[in-house]
UniProtKB/Swiss-Prot annotation:
Keyword Mitochondrion: no
Subcellular location, principal: nucleus
Database matches in InterPro entries: H1/H5, Histone_H1/H5_H15, WH-like_DNA-bd_sf, WH_DNA-bd_sf
Naturally occurring in which organism (per UniProt): Chironomus thummi thummi (Midge)
A single BP term in Gene Ontology: chromosome condensation
Official protein name in the record: Histone H1
UniProt cross-references to Pfam families, sorted A to Z: Linker_histone (PF00538)
Compartment list: Nucleus; Chromosome
Keyword match Nucleus: yes
Source taxonomy: Eukaryota, Metazoa, Ecdysozoa, Arthropoda, Hexapoda
Keyword terms, alphabetized: Chromosome, DNA-binding, Nucleus
Alphabetized SUPFAM superfamilies for the sequence: Winged helix' DNA-binding domain (SSF46785)
Basic residues compositional bias, start-end: 145-171, 178-213, 221-231
Known role: Histones H1 are necessary for the condensation of nucleosome chains into higher-order structures.
Amino acid sequence: MSDPAIEVAPVPVASPAKAKKEKKPKSDKPKKPKAPRTHPPVSDMIVNAIKTLKERGGSSVQAIKKFLVAQYKVDTDKLSPFIKKYLKSAVEKGQLLQTKGKGASGSFKLPAAAKKEKVVKKVTKKVTEKKPKKAVSKPKTGEKKVKKTIAKKPKVASATKIKKPVAKTTKKPAAAKPTKKVAAKPKAAPKPKAAPKPKVAKPKKAAAPKAKKPAAEKKPKAAKKPSAKKA
């Protein structure tokens, strides 16, 4: 018996991967340059406002906003969230002291240490734009000066070479005469002053002793003759 024909199921052919959708090239539109800031950062403006107002009990938020409008001509309604945010963080960090109220409302004052700091100066764009121009012009002037000096140097060298054959009498430096050191004569020792002569006491003239007359010598008595013994 013949085997029945085995039907082979067709193998599904792998369909080619769908081509990825090509990304549309972004239109290179020139980005609008951000409008330059016409005022310094909010933190600097608030610090400057509190310093200039110099209120003993601290400056209120309304007073600070009025100062910002008058000094920097800014829209305080747009800056109010930034003002509140800075006031809260400054109080937490110890950069500001809150004398009244809580949170971002109330009055604020600078601590004693912050008052000594200098007020930040405004930096306008005109000053920053002029600086690079000056920096570019400086090297140009420097190059011209270098070229002029290099061109002049060989001329000076040639002039000196021509003058070399002329023998110049160079004056010999006069020999320094040895200075004889005259020995300083020793000063004569001062003569010793004569010792004062001791005063000799003149002996008083002794009174001449009167010569005593010698006493008359007594004549010796004649020895008695022995009497003749009687027989």
